[in-house]
Amino acid sequence: MSKKYEGPSMMEELWEYVKMIVFVVVIVFIINNVLLINARIPSESMEKTIMTGDRVFGNRLAYMTKDPERFDIVIFKFPDDESQLFIKRVIGLPGETVTIKDGKVYINDSEEPLDDSFVAETPVGDFGPYKVPEGSYFMLGDNRNH
């Protein structure tokens, strides 16, 4: 007499689903906390490049093998309030002197201002000179009047 195959028990099947769900949760956790950063744009400081309310993903590992370059858009925690994420553009590099005259950005007493084709509107005001400390970067939003 042949024995009839009954398949996995209900508990075995349930256990397989639980393992699959735990696996997916672990993968999502790793992606969200190690590989990617998911941020919502809270203000108009980066408009016209990134609009208020947009969601952006950043690569948490991007600067493990290289340093940020001028004009990179980076997501970072503000040193004085690490609970908030900021999204800005790298303008000044470590050791450089940044000066803003009539809304134009100058690096190290250059006669030529930096490219500002991505800036939403012509900013007003002056700033600096400011020497960027080693290990730090000078960041600005693209919508400089906000």
Which role does the model predict for each range below?
Residues 2-19, 30, 34-40, 47-146:
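Soluble "head" domains of membrane/secretory-pathway proteins
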Residues 23-26:
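Residues within membrane-spanning alpha-helices of integral membrane proteins
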